[in-house]
Regions:
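Membrane-embedded segments
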Residues: 106, 113-118, 122-171
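Hydrophobic membrane-insertion alpha-helices, especially the h-region
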Residues: 17-36
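C-terminal functional extensions of proteins
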Residues: 253-255, 262-320
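A substrate-binding/cap region within the structured catalytic cores of diverse enzymes
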Residues: 169-252, 256
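Ser/Thr/Pro/Gly-rich low-complexity linker/stalk segments immediately outside membranes or between
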Residues: 37-53
């Protein structure tokens, strides 16, 4: 399945079931609905010690990173992480407005608050799935994690929806490699894939496929990360779980953050269309063979933060 802001591409074989669920999913997304898990409990007016300092640090890291990308591209900071509508690496439609929303410096601050609310503390291991669709939010997750002293292990994909990290030379893994080389942020990515259909960009034409896979291989080398080039969907899932297992080195996963709509994260089952944005509940919602990382992490009892329909979440978190 491939999903971007405002557009959901339903995987082959589930179109009939998805027809009913799609409407409900879009209504929930438009409303910005979110389910807070039981472990968060009620929010209070108290501020954890150091939260605002960490939020300031996260915003500073984010702004510094955006500035580096802006200078490299020769554009303003407001346009630094917004790519072209169509390139050989674009797999799905997206909305330019949603990409602009994702460029707010309030995202790293909001994520520090959310991570504190979920009980995350220095040294905790957080797994993540980053597509190329929302590089601004990928950076926000990285900045918040670094400011809080979290150990972040991400699997990053090359392909993007339109207006995301869609330009060759400035795909998401290339951006991260540039920022890590500049010393702006600690490396987060532990594995890189081409993304798209089959996790091998099979929904692109021949030129797009070869470019995506070349970028994935090159960035994996630059970042000292695994290259994921799976034979099938199940192998794409296993490769990610193996990468997370290696990164956590026996420590428990404190949370899983999904940004964007990669097939491996969302899966091929229509059950994902019922999932709301934000922190997910603890009850498993999909047991099908086609379930993705989001469903499997919930199943394993790992707190999951799902960031896909960004405008609704931005309203709920006070970003808009």
């Amino acid at each position: 399945m491939s999903i971007s802001q405002g557009v959901i591409r339903v995987p082959r074989g589930v179109q009939t079931a998805a027809g009913v669920l799609l409407t409900a999913g879009l209504v929930l997304a438009a409303a910005g609905a979110v389910v807070l898990p039981r472990w968060l409990g009620p929010r209070t007016a108290s501020t954890p010690a150091g939260l605002e300092t960490q939020a300031d640090d996260a915003e500073r890291l984010w702004r510094q990173a955006v500035g580096i990308v802006a200078r490299a591209r020769g554009v303003s900071t407001g346009e630094a992480l917004i790519g072209s509508e169509w390139t050989p690496l674009v797999t799905t439609l997206g909305e330019a407005e949603a990409k602009r929303v994702s460029m707010s410096p309030a995202w790293p601050r909001a994520l520090v608050r959310e991570f504190h609310g979920a009980g995350l503390r220095r040294g905790d291991v957080v797994a993540a799935s980053f597509s190329g669709s929302f590089p601004g939010i990928n950076l926000a997750v990285m900045s918040a994690a670094e400011a809080m002293g979290l150990s972040l292990a991400a699997v990053s994909s090359v392909t993007s929806s339109s207006w995301g990290a869609s330009d060759p030379g400035f795909t998401w893994p290339e951006m991260e490699a540039r920022l890590v080389a500049a010393g702006a942020l600690r490396k987060a990515t532990v594995a890189v894939s081409a993304g798209g259909d089959g996790d091998r960009a099979l929904d692109l034409d021949g030129d797009g496929q070869s470019r995506a896979r070349e970028i994935a291989a090159r960035c994996a080398g630059q970042l000292g990360a695994r290259l994921i080039d799976p034979a099938d969907f199940e192998e794409a899932i296993r490769a990610r779980l193996d990468a997370f297992d290696e990164a956590r080195a026996g420590r428990p996963l404190a949370a899983f953050v999904n940004v964007g709509g990669t097939e491996a994260a969302l899966g091929r089952s229509p059950a994902i269309l019922k999932v709301q944005n934000g922190w997910l509940g603890k009850a498993p919602f999909d047991s099908s063979p086609g379930r993705g990382l989001v469903a499997r992490m919930v199943e394993q009892g790992v707190p999951v933060l799902h960031i896909l329909h960004v405008r609704g979440l931005a309203v709920r978190w006070g970003i808009l």
